[in-house]
From Swiss-Prot:
GO terms for molecular function: manganese ion binding; UDP-2,3-diacylglucosamine hydrolase activity. Keywords: Cell inner membrane, Cell membrane, Hydrolase, Lipid A biosynthesis, Lipid biosynthesis, Lipid metabolism, Manganese, Membrane, Metal-binding. Its main location: membrane. The keyword Glycoprotein does not apply. One of its GO terms (biological process) is lipid A biosynthetic process. Binds 2 Mn(2+) ions per subunit in a binuclear metal center. The gene is lpxH. The lineage of its organism: Bacteria, Pseudomonadati, Pseudomonadota, Gammaproteobacteria, Enterobacterales. Signal peptide: none annotated. This is UDP-2,3-diacylglucosamine hydrolase. InterPro entries: Calcineurin-like_PHP_ApaH (IPR004843), LpxH-like (IPR043461), Metallo-depent_PP-like (IPR029052), UDP-diacylglucosamine_Hdrlase (IPR010138). It comes from Salmonella agona (strain SL483). Mn(2+) 2 binds at residues 41, 79, 114, 195.
């Protein structure tokens, strides 16, 4: 009896080892779970459900196979794949969740999210996020030809990489006050998120009680998952 959480796989054809590791994870660990939650940035980039990239179909089929054996799979959008829509959700069998969700896991109330909304010290990123999450901007982007969308996405990734190279690590991490405010708002003592690529279990105080923030790692040379059971919450790194 366990519920699994992963995030920040950044799947792309240029990283076949990570793709293969994820497919193995779906074939083994995921099938033994009560449920699988993917907390964003499953893909390195997403320019629309109509992108014919074969990798997308392969991943959709692999997730659907997990769903078909009775393991529900849920998805929260990340900052790289926020345009994943209903078509891909149908193909993969995933259930799309809002950007924040509270789960009752074996008696624990756990808040889950991608995590980028916690990085409120990075004003430039938050302004950019507000623009690209505007429904009108998204609709306009999705009407463009695929080759133009690819160019725009590549330019945005390059710009993001350049901008991040000049930012301090502290600015790109979560804001402690924002974390506490979110946990107090949702009345939880547990938070699980990704985005920062800094796997750790942080202890803090929320509502004058002990609380925990569990940060998933990105999938690079190893995989990262959070495993929640009736008795424990574990942050686990494993070879790909």
């Amino acid at each position: 009896m366990a519920t699994l959480f992963i995030a920040d796989l950044h799947l792309q054809t240029e990283e076949p080892a990570i793709v293969a590791g994820f497919l193995r994870f779906l074939a083994v660990e995921a099938r033994q779970a009560d449920a699988l939650y993917i907390l964003g940035d499953l893909f390195e980039a997403w320019i629309g459900d109509d992108d014919p990239n074969p990798l997308h179909r392969e991943i959709a089929a692999a997730i659907k196979a997990v769903v078909n054996v009775g393991v529900p799979c849920f998805f929260i959008h990340g900052n790289r794949d926020f345009l994943i829509g209903k078509r891909f959700a149908r193909e993969s069998g995933m259930i799309l969740l809002p950007q924040e969700k509270v789960l009752d896991l074996y008696g624990r109330n756990v808040l889950i999210m991608h995590g980028d909304t916690l990085c409120t010290d990075d004003a430039g990123y938050q302004a950019f996020r507000a623009k690209v999450h505007n429904p009108w901007v998204q609709r306009l982007f999705l009407t463009l030809p695929l080759f133009i969308r690819r160019r725009i996405a590549a330019r945005m990734r390059a710009g993001s990489k350049a901008a991040n190279s000049s930012k301090s690590l502290d600015i790109m991490d979560v804001n402690a006050q924002t974390v506490v405010a979110e946990m107090e708002k949702h009345r939880v003592q547990w938070l699980v998120h990704g985005h920062t690529h800094r796997p750790a279990v942080h202890e803090l105080s929320v509502n004058d009680q002990p609380a925990f923030r569990v940060v998933l790692g990105a999938w690079h040379h190893e995989g990262s998952m959070v495993k929640v059971t009736p008795d424990n919450v574990e942050l686990i790194a494993f070879p790909l």
